A protein has these predicted regions:
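Short, well-ordered secondary-structure micro-motifs
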Residues: 5-9, 25-28, 66, 97
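S-adenosyl-L-methionine
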Residues: 1-16
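Mobile active-site "lid"/loop adjacent to the S-adenosyl-L-methionine
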Residues: 12-42
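Helix-to-beta-strand junctions that scaffold the AdoMet/dcAdoMet cofactor pocket
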Residues: 47-49
Length: 114
C-alpha cells in the first residue's frame, strides 16, 4: 500500500506519482487501470488546494487516453477539481516507430489541483 511520510497536517504542495509499469501485457490492462486510479485517488487526497500533482505511467499497454481516464476518474472519486497544466511524453531519445505505436509508453500529466 502507498504510504506517505508523516507531517503535521499530512497534506503536501507537490506530489510525484511515478510507479513501475502496472501492466506488461494486455491481460493486465484492467487491473493496471484500477491501480492507476487507486494510486491517484491517494495522491489527490493528500495534496493541498492549489497543489501540483505529477503523475506518470510507463505501461506500454496503457494508452494515453486510458491513463487520462484513470486519473480523471481518481479526481472525481476524491472530489477534487483538476486542470491539466502540461501533458508529458517520452523524449527524443525514445523514438516511436510508426509500425509499433505501443512504443509510445512513457506518459505523464502535470495537474493543478483546486
Amino acid at each position: 500500500p502507498l504510504k506517505f511520510p508523516p507531517s503535521h497536517d499530512d497534506k503536501y504542495d507537490l506530489i510525484i506519482l511515478d510507479p513501475p509499469a502496472f501492466a506488461k501485457h494486455r491481460g493486465a490492462l484492467r487491473n493496471a487501470l484500477k491501480g492507476y486510479t487507486r494510486l491517484n485517488v491517494k495522491g489527490f487526497q493528500r495534496i493541498r488546494k492549489g497543489g501540483i500533482l505529477f503523475t506518470f505511467s510507463c505501461s506500454q499497454v496503457v494508452s494515453k487516453e486510458h491513463f487520462r481516464q484513470a486519473v480523471f476518474t481518481a479526481a472525481a472519486q476524491a472530489g477534487r477539481k483538476v486542470r491539466i497544466l502540461h501533458q508529458l511524453h517520452q523524449p527524443a531519445d525514445h523514438p516511436i516507430n510508426i509500425y509499433h505505436p505501443e512504443g509510445e509508453y512513457l506518459k505523464g500529466l502535470v495537474l493543478y489541483v483546486e
